Design a protein with these regions (language model features):
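Binuclear metal-ion centers of metallo-dependent hydrolases, dominated by the metallo-beta-lactamase
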Residues: 152-161, 169-253
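Active-site neighborhood of phospho(di)ester-bond hydrolases with catalytic His/Asp-centered motifs
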Residues: 22-26, 43-50, 54, 79-80, ...
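Metallo-beta-lactamase
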Residues: 72-129, 136-137, 230
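Metal-dependent catalytic neighborhoods of phosphoester/phosphodiester hydrolases
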Residues: 57-66, 89-91, 205-214
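Conserved catalytic scaffold of divalent metal-dependent phosphoesterases
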Residues: 114-115, 136, 159-170
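Conserved beta-strand hairpin/beta-sheet module of binuclear metal-dependent hydrolase folds
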Residues: 1-36, 129-145, 161
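Short beta->alpha connector loops
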Residues: 27-28, 83, 123-126, 145-150
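Active-site metal-binding motif and surrounding structural segment of the metallo-beta-lactamase
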Residues: 28-78, 158-161
Length: 253
């Protein structure tokens, strides 16, 4: 999907009460962001869930863009340790450009302005990988990043909004990714107001994610949305009130 860019792989741009966070800048992140009038020079933080290229491909250029090529020391980069040690995806020469680099660990909590987030559990994935619970002044939402499904996985996440990386249509024992039936179990346990499916593999894509999402809505009673390139989701939808004074969440996967 990434190599052919059947879906864009630039990650997600979180705009939370004035705080700008880029999550998982995969290949094309810079192009997708500027195309959508999102200015990387305004980023407060870049978060990397894990070092795989579909999540990290553009992280170096986005660090450069956030810091005006290193001329302005600003912003924070969050990444697991193995994105920085041997065979690093974050180049050494630009590690002094951001204000700091913070290492993600299991059970960690972090802050960017008045947004906080936690990395509750190390995921089952070939490299060190974390999902996130984000808390703003008004909302809590979880993003379940790549992982093999495991017992109690849903119990680590919470919130009115659940975003899940659904790579596979059906579970495959040998692949460390979530499948649609597993994400259904997560939705049924967390019972968010809204769930967003994203990060589709080829079989998911061929099965028309928007139709799968509609079926899942009927089966679970939770409003399930299939993400699409450039989709913008306003967190005010969780309140059922006017979007004024609220934060928005745009994604460009
Ligand atoms: Zn991965």
């Amino acid at each position: 999907m990434v190599a052919r860019q059947l879906l864009a792989s630039g990650g997600a741009w979180l705009s939370l009460g004035g705080t700008q966070i880029l999550l998982d800048p995969g290949p094309g992140s810079l192009v997708q962001a500027t195309k959508r009038k999102l200015d990387p020079a305004k980023l407060d933080a870049i978060i990397l869930s894990h070092r795989h290229l579909d999540h990290s491909g553009d992280i170096n250029i986005m660090i450069e863009a956030m810091t005006d090529g290193g001329r302005k020391k600003r912003g924070v980069v969050f990444a697991p340790n193995d994105a920085l040690d041997q065979d690093p995806v974050i180049l050494s020469y630009l590690r002094s450009f951001p204000e700091k680099i913070e290492i993600l660990t299991e059970g960690g909590s972090y802050k960017v302005n008045d947004v906080s987030f936690t990395t509750p559990i190390k995921h089952r994935h070939p490299v060190e990988t974390y999902g996130f619970i984000f808390r703003t002044q008004h909302h809590t939402f979880s993003w379940v990043i790549d992982t093999k499904y495991f017992d109690k996985l849903p119990s680590y996440y919470e919130g009115e909004l659940l975003i899940a990386n659904v790579v596979m249509l059906n579970p495959k024992v040998a692949v460390d990714h979530l499948s649609l039936p597993e994400v259904k179990m997560i939705i049924e346990e967390i019972k968010p107001k809204i769930a967003i499916l994203t990060h589709f593999g080829m079989n998911m894509w061929r099965a028309r994610p928007w139709e799968l999402a509609r079926n899942l809505s009927e089966e679970t009673g939770v409003s399930v949305i299939a993400a699409r390139d450039g989709m913008k989701f306003d967190l005010a939808r969780l309140e059922g009130v006017s979007p004024e004074a609220s934060s928005g969440l745009a994604r460009f996967e």
